[in-house]
Amino acid sequence: MRRFWIFNHYATTPLTGPLLRHFYFAEYLKEKGIETTVFAANELHQTGGCVDTHGKPYLRTEEEGVPFVFVKTSKYEGNGISRVKNMVSFFLGLLKISKGYAKQYGKPDVIMGSSAHPLECLHGNLLLDLTA
């Protein structure tokens, strides 16, 4: 089976928020026989909510057959420096967990960095060796 990873800082599941484009895209790819995992921050954008990672670097959940990985990030409020720190913590957290996640669940064939902010696209480039 082919594996496809989607990196989007603000992606949510139907249970965690309204930003579902990546969830629905993953469902569509699953119907086509492509195992798709969505990676997102555990601090939920525009809701003030947070997915508890239980003190671990990430929490893997599955909703309606779509694996979601919530990466532990710093809390933020508004559009100030705390939000920039949150973006950086997602970037660094995702880099930190990716190789171990690939070892445990299988390497991706494709990585898509969905551009929520400038750091998002760098993930795919920096993790190209995972697809080799």
Regions found by a protein language model. Name each.
Residues 14, 84-93, 98, 108-131:
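An aromatic- and histidine-rich active-site surface loop
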Residues 1-64:
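N-terminal subdomain of nucleotide-sugar transferases
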Residues 1, 33, 107-108, 132:
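A general structural motif
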Residues 19, 106-109:
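Intrinsic disorder/low-complexity signature
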Residues 16-17, 48-49, 80, 121-124:
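Short glycine-/acidic-enriched loop or helix-start segments at secondary-structure transitions
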Residues 38-105:
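A conserved catalytic-core segment of Leloir-type glycosyltransferases
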Residues 11-12, 43-44, 75-76, 117-119:
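Short, solvent-exposed loop/turn segments at secondary-structure junctions
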